[in-house]
């Protein structure tokens, strides 16, 4: 295997939306960094039965709805 071509693989802390933390290894960030999740399996509508609304982060959902609002409408 070639040396010095692989990214640094180190320990980080992942913080779930409910505050739960766990340790894992990743190439993200630096050793000891915390990765705060906005959506995780406990809060994502796909895994919770869709009872919660998806956050409109940066207006993306609004732009999509505006762009395709008339796509399936019949005249």
UniProtKB/Swiss-Prot annotation:
<comment type="function">
    <text>Binds the 23S rRNA.</text>
</comment>
<dbReference type="InterPro" id="IPR027491">
    <property type="entry name" value="Ribosomal_bL31_A"/>
</dbReference>
<dbReference type="GO" id="GO:0005840">
    <property type="term" value="C:ribosome"/>
</dbReference>
<comment type="subunit">
    <text>Part of the 50S ribosomal subunit.</text>
</comment>
<dbReference type="GO" id="GO:0019843">
    <property type="term" value="F:rRNA binding"/>
</dbReference>
<dbReference type="Pfam" id="PF01197">
    <property type="entry name" value="Ribosomal_L31"/>
</dbReference>
<keyword id="KW-0699">rRNA-binding</keyword>
<comment type="similarity">
    <text>Belongs to the bacterial ribosomal protein bL31 family. Type A subfamily.</text>
</comment>
<keyword id="KW-0694">RNA-binding</keyword>
<dbReference type="InterPro" id="IPR002150">
    <property type="entry name" value="Ribosomal_bL31"/>
</dbReference>
<dbReference type="GO" id="GO:0006412">
    <property type="term" value="P:translation"/>
</dbReference>
<keyword id="KW-0689">Ribosomal protein</keyword>
<dbReference type="GO" id="GO:1990904">
    <property type="term" value="C:ribonucleoprotein complex"/>
</dbReference>
<dbReference type="GO" id="GO:0003735">
    <property type="term" value="F:structural constituent of ribosome"/>
</dbReference>
<protein>
    <recommendedName>
        <fullName>Large ribosomal subunit protein bL31</fullName>
    </recommendedName>
</protein>
<dbReference type="InterPro" id="IPR034704">
    <property type="entry name" value="Ribosomal_bL28/bL31-like_sf"/>
</dbReference>
<dbReference type="InterPro" id="IPR042105">
    <property type="entry name" value="Ribosomal_bL31_sf"/>
</dbReference>
<keyword id="KW-0687">Ribonucleoprotein</keyword>
